[in-house]
Amino acid sequence: EIASCLVGSEMCIRDRSIGNTVKWTVVNLVVQLVAAMLLALALNQKLKGRSVYRTLILVPWAVPHAIAAMTFTFLYNANVGIINILAVKLGMITESVSWLGNVGSAFWCVILVAIWKGIPFQMIFILAALQGISRDVYESAEIDGASRWQCFWRITLPIIKEPLAISTVLNLIGIVSCFNTIWLMTKGGPLYSTEIVYTYAYRRAFIDHNFGTAAAASVVLFIFMAVFSGVYLKMVSEKE
């Protein structure tokens, strides 16, 4: 399938970018949501040094996309990257791997960076919502014999569902519109394995000078972003 994209199949490249966009969005959204929820629940407990942990977790969010992309590109480097050095020493691989130059691993290496940067954003929303729940509610539930799992499903989740939904939509907009990380790390390669609709539109417009195709892809992206933005605005207005 990938090889056929190299022989000029515009439809194949376009379809692959759409498929990658869907996979990129779903994996990012699910992993970031679950990880953010777990971290927020942990930081909502009375932990020693909680403020330090909170600050450290927020660091990825504060790092600019360009800095994060360059840093991880260096870490993934086949010759001097720390990931290869550690993996070889631990016996996980026998020789250095070009992680970003390999069709099978490039997509997952880039998505790992996006997940690393995206988790803190959603965690802030969830943690803020959790801190608004009175401890008395949980104490009453525990007296009635409710387990922690039951408290989460019957108390926590219903109370934070609105801010959780809003943060998820905002995160979704950021995930779908992500361009910098992919372009700086792989430019959609190798062999279009990390190509998403945004990089596809950029390539067609500014490299291939095919402005018609780029404009069509941009219109589709605009429609999706408008829908997500509309959902977000509706949620905010209903909450108010």
Where are these predicted regions, by residue range?
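A structural signal for multi-pass alpha-helical bundles of membrane permease subunits
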Residues: S4, S9-E10, R14-E240
